[in-house]
Amino acid sequence: VNLTVLCPHFDPDLAPTGVVMSRIAHEFVERGHRLHVVTALPWYVRHDVEPGWEGRLVRTERTDWGRISRVHPFPTDKRNIPARALAFGGFTTLATLVGASARERPDAVLAMSPPLTLGPAGRVVAGLRRAPLVFNIQDVFPDVAVELGLLTGARVIALARRLERMSYRAADAVTVLSDDLADNVRGKIAAGLPTDAAERQRAKVRVIPNFVDTDRIRPGDRDNDYRLEFELIGSRVVMYAGNVGFSQSLDLVIEAARRLVDSHPDVVFVINGGGSARPELERAAGHSPNIRFVDMQPIERLPEVLAAADVHVVPLRTGLAWSSVPSKLYSILAAGRPLVASVDEGTEVARTVVRAGAGVAVPPDDADAFVAALLGVLEDPAAAERMGAAGRRFVEGWASPAAVAEAYEGLFTELVDRSGQDPRSG
């Protein structure tokens, strides 16, 4: 089939959603499909357009499998909601125009959120080409922004929720990462509708998890080049690797480091990555000898970064685990390392940690429980080894990149068949 993809990030951008979509696109190509990817110019790492990519609103690349159109993302401070809304509006407008004006007629359109605005953009592109739309939800917005206090005011929140419902209902299918997120979206998509219409809307929501590449991410030596480069040899390493944003309770990591600096001087807390919250965290950390900030590493080093930890942490602020499933969770399991998750009880993240036997789940923003869990893992190397091995065994049965692409392929085929469209006519 010919597929149009609207997404906020794509290779070589290093955003987690960009890595996910790039690999799924690769799998689509391997299956013989052609793609037109409409995305942003690379900007995630520096929160600004990368050197060499500036100076143009739209940049088009031809490939042997189709085309990539990159449009300006208009990056702004995440905490400045009005400016960010305008930025999303600018990016979405450009993406819509580029997607709608392409000569190739897509057989299906795949749009990714966040940003939520790509849902209506996908609807416009799909509607003009009489193609079905699949709306993929990585994080549920505006829930995340509301929980973080980034979106305030009853009218603003009501408007955002109206846009959310409209986007879900306008799609032919909505894909989410977990049962928690499916329940969340089904409740909203059916709200206020008659029984029959509500059931039809709920039936559109499908669970297709993000993949984990267990062939690329494998258990490795702790004392590797990463540890050598950042002077971690001989230390017990507590690692956070990922986006340093406001969704994560990384102040909990700073507090844990403060509590252990004297009693456990060989324990070093590493925050590997960049993001809007990092400057504030660095100020809070001061000159603590047991905290290291490391810039985001090239994607090729991910297995090495993950292997360097004795224990990983996945801290989410209260309420956020109901609307977000960090992809890093499955990468940690693939690396064969134990983890401590500070998340809401009963959520997908907490259930996965317990079900896999791969670590400890504690309540969010509870420093006492968090520190106790870390020490429990660090002080019992044999148990930590068992947890890591159990996580690896668990994730080996998880969705591979090929399996996730196959699930989407089946969904596209179902929707195209239902619409009566012949893919060969495009």
Regions found by a protein language model. Name each.
Residues 264, 278-303:
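Nucleotide-activated donor-binding/catalytic signature segment of Leloir-type glycosyltransferases, i.e.
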Residues 41, 180, 211:
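Carbohydrate-associated surface elements
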Residues 248, 296-307, 312-333, 339-351:
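Nucleotide-sugar-dependent
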Residues 100, 117-120, 124-128, 154-176:
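Membrane-proximal helix-turn-helix segments that form the acceptor-binding/catalytic region
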Residues 365, 369, 379-412:
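A charged, aromatic-enriched C-terminal amphipathic alpha-helix characteristic of glycosyltransferases
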Residues 1-62, 260, 402, 425:
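N-terminal subdomain of nucleotide-sugar transferases
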Residues 51-58, 190-195, 218-231:
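A short helix/loop element that forms part of the nucleotide-sugar donor recognition site in Leloir-type
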Residues 212, 232-248, 254-258, 270:
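Conserved donor-binding/catalytic core segment of Leloir-type glycosyltransferases
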